[in-house]
Amino acid sequence: MIEQSRNPAFSISLKTSFSCWANVSGKGAYSSMHNHNPALFSGVYYVDPGEPAAPQSKSGLIEFMDPRVLAGPVPSQAFHPPVLLQPKAGMMLIFPGWLMHFVHPYQGSGQRISIAFNLRVKSYDLNDLGSTG
């Protein structure tokens, strides 16, 4: 596949859409668990993450769930714990649109400002003009 993609006769035509929105959140704001299907990639840019979470607090942290829920009878927390991230000003996170995530309730006194976005592939066309078979 890699060699074929270097062939100038092989091309991919994509039709995409990009959407974004701003989130301005105050104390108590949160985001319940969700994903961004059918987006190929999603992300968030933190303009102002508000007050950082206190030690041992999850205030305003974004949490990504392990997608391997069908891994069998292994203790989930022991082998693949969720990923918790403390937002910082200027931080951008990009992740697969299917990845489940949520934001813990924000307990700071200031406002949080973030910009979320989705990149969706609406259609694609593979053209392999060099194909002989």
What are these regions (language model features)?
Residues 1-10, 30:
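Non-heme Fe(II)/2-oxoglutarate
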Residues 16-94, 104, 111, 121-132:
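Catalytic core of non-heme Fe(II) oxygenases with the double-stranded beta-helix
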